[in-house]
């Protein structure tokens, strides 16, 4: 059942959460050097940005591919729909021939990677919202300084709630609630621990940002992220009943595998649900296209792109377009597709960009 946060008084209690990410060493055998942006596509760039800005204090940011600039350079504002771009190279990269598009680069406090919204026009797109248990679903997890304050803002906006009972629940990672942004994209909000708040390097509502993706089979996902890309495995555990309820589930189990993106201390969670055969609604896998509202995308910095593409193809993984990188002044770009339909962009910076 989908609930809505209405303007009511809510009392919430702070519990533990992990600290914000920092740069870390890259394993010698990993082609991944970091994460530029976590991207999801939107049906309305302004509406989505205002939600994240007004709820979490997220700000516009410069594109990581914009080149050098002065410290005081302002981020590019959101382009009006009438000025949405059209570029044959982007069509080749994203398999969106004939489309127009615009992007919004954002930055959350205490987050070592960027957030990006992309919006496409003049091309068919799906608007099916994901449920947490759908293979290929994703969500952003914001661990925040003051959950009460964030929930109050969500309540004012009458935000749709996925969590059973409509309020935050106690979990091993702190009190948490799962909601939907204006597009229906999943956003989990957790209360940070006192230690995490004290250790935060920057002010702002967000203490840490994590990425969560739902997978059909954990072992298959690990073959892609750990074996092919060198993501670092940090642990696996079974979710508590409260964590199931946070995700709108009352029956079954959830196995959560926590990983780190090489090069930065950014957390990625692989979520493998096991639900009864008669569970309703049933799990519905995704076949994402870049233009689909909610389409999740990693934008990874990589080294040795040609060798990585060869290994990716040899392992039987698909590419979004023809699998040939496009060349930009910054470097080369190409999209692979993970076993559950998540779009994974490989970006190899040129020597000059490095």
Where would I find each of the regions flagged by the language model?
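Positively charged n-region of N-terminal signal peptides that target proteins for export
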Residues: 1-4
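Bacterial N-terminal signal peptides
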Residues: 7-17
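Vicinal oxygen chelate
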Residues: 21-31, 62-64, 112-119, 141-142, ...
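Core segments of cupin and vicinal oxygen chelate
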Residues: 41-112, 169-170, 214-267, 314, ...
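Helix N-cap motif at beta-to-alpha junctions
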Residues: 43-45, 145-147, 217-218, 303-305
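ER-lumen resident redox/N-glycosylation machinery signature
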Residues: 86-95, 127-129, 282-285
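Eukaryotic phosphotyrosine signaling hubs
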Residues: 135-139, 209, 295-296
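Flexible internal linker/loop segments at domain or repeat junctions
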Residues: 268-290
